[in-house]
Amino acid sequence: MKSLTLFAICCLISLSASAQSQNEPTRKGFVFGFSSGIANSHIKFPSKKQNNTNFALNWKVGYMLNPKLALLINGAVSVYEYDLSDRKRLRDFGGVFTSAQYFMTDKFWVLGGVGIGTDAPVFYDIKPENTVETKYYSGLGLVSSVGYEIYRKNNFALDLQARINYTTVNLPLGKTNGFTTAFLVGINFY
């Protein structure tokens, strides 16, 4: 009876170790991710403060240095309604950042980065005949986000993300800065 019990325990331990090794993520090599969701922008213009809720995008491209750490180029797009000109129009208050993403657990990750903050036209709301609308402005930008992978299979993962970014730019009317928070659903390939 003792040998049968010992044999059963050894089989269970072996099966458990095998199942755990199959569930561990295989993050290596190049990383690509894209997410979309909703963003809330708090922007302080020289003449007024503005709050907007609109569409958000995020993209990232990089390389896994090890199964827990990736170095990335990360883009954050947060659309807002600019109304300090002759017509209301949509613009992006986001940026492009060099960032590091670290997996605290096999599903939960944190990301931080610094780069170029932007105030740029949104391609689907440009009137090319108005040259003011086609101007890009840049400055300092910071990004921080957290995410949780809700589904993973092989080198594909689906995650939920919360992002905050700070941008400061010099517009023709003066220095403009603000925070944008976003909640996103993302797809990632490792």
Predicted features along the sequence, with ranges:
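Transmembrane beta-strands of outer-membrane beta-barrel pores
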Residues: 36-42, 77-81, 116-122, 150, ...
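Outer-membrane beta-barrel biogenesis signature
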Residues: 3-5, 11-35, 149-151, 155-156
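Predominantly the C-terminal beta-signal and adjacent terminal strand-loop region
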Residues: 25, 132, 142-190
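Membrane-embedded beta-strand positions of outer-membrane beta-barrel proteins
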Residues: 32-36, 73, 98-100, 110-114, ...
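Short glycine/proline- and aromatic-enriched beta-strand/turn motifs that initiate or cap beta-hairpins
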Residues: 20-80, 180, 186-190
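Repeated loop/turn-to-beta-strand initiation elements of outer-membrane beta-barrel proteins
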Residues: 68-73, 107-110, 152-158
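Outer-membrane beta-barrel translocator domains and adjoining extracellular loop/strand segments
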Residues: 43-50, 83-91, 122-130, 170-177
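Residues that define the transmembrane beta-barrel architecture of outer-membrane proteins
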Residues: 28-30, 51-55, 90-94, 136-142, ...
